[in-house]
Amino acid sequence: MKYSNDIVIDVSVDEIIAIFENPENLKHWQPDIKSFTHLKGDLGQPGAVTRLKVDMIIREIEMTETVISRNVPDAIVLKYEADGVVNTVTNSFIVLAPSKTKWVMNNHFTFAGFMKFASGPLKPIFRKKTYDTMKQLKKFAESR
């Protein structure tokens, strides 16, 4: 399953990347993340691995986040792995004006086991949740 979302944020590209990459900011724009534990590598750099505990609608899930590549502002590629799900996310930040940035997020999910069968009806839910998260980052960044 693949999809893309984008949003325009009224802050500079450098500021939005700094906010995006700072784990201390997660509570402000990703409140469903209940814990963030850095496991290895240099935080935010290729090869870094983090364990996340995320409060989903019906239960808490644990996943790992691996930084695949970091070429800001063009692409920050992250891979998220949980039971039956792998999501590779490419985040791109495009300068529209000195204080205006377009954030484009491309998601590529692969599913295994039960999730392979359940994934079809979930696409609109995943897409909406992704966009809601992007709106939360926009709100946080613009209110600072």
Where are these regions (language model features)?
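Hydrophobic pocket/interface hotspot
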Residues: 16-20, 26, 50-52, 67, ...
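Generic structural detector for well-ordered beta-strands
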Residues: 6-10, 37, 53, 66, ...
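Short, surface-exposed coil-to-beta transition loops
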Residues: 2-4, 60-64, 86-90
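Short structured motifs
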Residues: 3, 35-37, 75-76, 88-90
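A short, compositionally biased micro-patch
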Residues: 10, 29, 70-71, 96
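Glycine-rich portal/gate segments that line the openings of hydrophobic small-molecule binding cavities
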Residues: 37-84, 132-144
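Hydrophobic ligand-binding cavity/cleft-lining segments
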Residues: 1-40, 45
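Beta-strand/loop substructures that line and gate deep hydrophobic ligand-binding cavities in soluble
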Residues: 81-132
